[in-house]
């Protein structure tokens, strides 16, 4: 069945002419139309664009090209600008916004021959951990349709997990690639801050946001990241650092690998069954030659309060551009300019976005800046220092991706703090700018759980290597949700 193939398998099959990119694209578009109404993972389905790109890929292949992503079907989280296609950011504010240009990530993947099947649902302006804040409705987890898929890249995760497509782009500001990957049995990687261009990626928190891939295997993530990564002069936060050969890195044996287990990751709040699954992964990695050491990240306890000052502060600044004047939602019959601003923003933004804008504006206001924003930035530096100390002793840090499996849709709506706590293990990588990866590690009551790996700056290859070697001796990543 074509929909069961991974990206790597698709690349080999297309090279062997087992089927055409157009045939594959039409098959998956049909599957999306048939099954996505159960999931709500797509905001826009780009049939005509996809078929045109697939035909072009087949032509390029007929002319001797043979790139790994040539003709590979993917979709983009709906905050990556796509020329001529709506880019909504999951918000009423941008419901009618059609981007005049491609984001660098989209441009690179398209140039490599990837076929865009559509734009994927997400928490509004990437603010959320459950994909319930989208203007287009909640996304459902294919492993249990009454549960969340995680967020904010929930549409990306649900679509790949349900085998609607082999891989998708996502973004990660506090765990928004890794957490949904864990809750839907996928592999997802957040690269080092500056590794992947943010140009054309609608900003939530500019010092934290980073784009990356979600797929079923580490090998597929390596294929995607190898194209997505690299310096971009259009992005002032992009880093001039050579891109490693991620595919070659997969094959390195793990003998001598030093793994650190932070004691803070295994304390109160962690489901004991997830802890058991994580420790089972550790034992398997030890049989592959890794050694394990207990470490400490003492400032992790301050990560969530620091994050929920810094991220909303940056969001309140970034989202000030959405005022009803140049593009996006505009209220009807404004009385004057002030009325235009107030009503356009009040009507265009959802409640979670407005909450975070208010928190961020408060944290930056005179009299509170030193008490909140400056203190949060000091904590951020302490968290970074903790990682620098830890990586002097170990090569990789390992722990759970989330403290709990997927919760029921609506279950945590009245208690936002409990929802924020689901990101407790992922936020620190964003605050420090480190690369992080989540990979499948088993199931609890039929729901997937993930293991998170963290590495020093620009060591994405090491993360992919560990995940790939583990996936050679495990089969969690091959499990498919019933009905899909």
Curated annotation (Swiss-Prot):
UniProt-listed GO biological process terms: translation
Keyword Membrane: no
Keyword list, A-Z: ATP-binding, Ligase, Nucleotide-binding, Protein biosynthesis
Statement: the UniProt record of this protein carries the keyword ATP-binding: yes
MF (Gene Ontology): ATP binding; glutaminyl-tRNA synthase (glutamine-hydrolyzing) activity
Source organism, top-level taxon: Bacteria
Function description: Allows the formation of correctly charged Gln-tRNA(Gln) through the transamidation of misacylated Glu-tRNA(Gln) in organisms which lack glutaminyl-tRNA synthetase. The reaction takes place in the presence of glutamine and ATP through an activated gamma-phospho-Glu-tRNA(Gln).
Protein name in UniProt: Glutamyl-tRNA(Gln) amidotransferase subunit A
Source organism of this protein record: Pseudomonas aeruginosa (strain ATCC 15692 / DSM 22644 / CIP 104116 / JCM 14847 / LMG 12228 / 1C / PRS 101 / PAO1)
Organism lineage string: Bacteria, Pseudomonadati, Pseudomonadota, Gammaproteobacteria, Pseudomonadales
């Amino acid at each position: 069945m074509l929909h069961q193939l991974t990206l790597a398998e698709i690349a080999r099959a297309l090279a062997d002419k087992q089927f055409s990119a157009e045939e594959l694209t039409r098959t998956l578009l049909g599957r999306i139309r048939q099954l996505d109404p159960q999931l709500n993972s797509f905001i826009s389905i780009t049939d005509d664009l996809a078929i045109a790109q697939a035909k072009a890929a087949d032509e390029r292949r007929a002319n001797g090209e043979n790139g790994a992503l040539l003709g590979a079907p993917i979709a983009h989280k709906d905050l990556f600008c796509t020329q001529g296609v709506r880019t909504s950011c999951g918000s009423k504010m941008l419901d009618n916004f059609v981007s005049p240009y491609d984001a660098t990530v989209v441009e690179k993947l398209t140039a490599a021959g990837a076929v865009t099947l559509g734009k994927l649902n997400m928490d509004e302006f990437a603010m959320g951990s459950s994909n319930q804040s989208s203007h287009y409705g909640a996304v459902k987890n294919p492993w249990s349709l009454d549960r969340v898929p995680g967020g904010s890249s929930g549409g990306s995760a649900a679509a790949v997990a349900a085998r609607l497509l082999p891989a998708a782009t996502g973004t990660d500001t506090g765990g928004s690639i890794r957490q949904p990957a864990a809750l839907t049995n996928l592999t997802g990687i957040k690269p080092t801050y500056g590794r992947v261009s943010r140009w054309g990626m609608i900003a939530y928190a500019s010092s934290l946001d980073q784009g990356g891939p979600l797929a079923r295997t580490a090998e597929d993530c390596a294929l995607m990241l190898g194209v997505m990564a690299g310096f971009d002069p259009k992005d002032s936060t992009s880093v001039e650092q050579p891109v490693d050969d991620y595919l070659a890195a997969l094959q390195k044996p793990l003998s001598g690998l030093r793994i650190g287990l932070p004691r803070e990751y295994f304390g109160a709040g962690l489901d004991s069954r997830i802890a058991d699954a994580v420790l089972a992964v550790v034992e398997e990695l030890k049989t592959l030659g890794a050694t394990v050491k207990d470490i400490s990240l003492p400032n992790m306890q301050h990560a969530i309060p620091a994050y929920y000052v810094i991220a909303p502060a940056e969001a309140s600044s970034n989202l000030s551009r959405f005022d009803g004047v140049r593009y996006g939602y505009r209220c009807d019959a404004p009385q004057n300019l002030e009325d235009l601003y107030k009503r356009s923003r009040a009507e265009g933004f959802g409640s979670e976005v407005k909450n975070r804008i208010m928190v961020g504006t408060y944290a930056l206001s005179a009299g509170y800046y030193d008490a909140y924003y400056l203190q949060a930035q000091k904590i951020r530096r302490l968290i970074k220092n903790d990682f620098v100390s830890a990586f002097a002793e170990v090569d990789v840090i390992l722990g759970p991706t989330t403290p709990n499996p997927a919760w029921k849709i609506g279950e945590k709506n009245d208690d936002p703090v409990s929802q924020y706590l689901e990101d407790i293990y992922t936020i620190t990588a964003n605050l420090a700018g480190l690369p992080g990866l989540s990979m499948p590690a088993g199931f609890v009551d039929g729901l997937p759980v993930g293991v998170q790996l963290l590495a020093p700056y620009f060591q994405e290859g090491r993360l992919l290597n560990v995940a790939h070697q583990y996936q050679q001796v495990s089969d969690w990543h091959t499990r498919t949700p019933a009905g899909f």
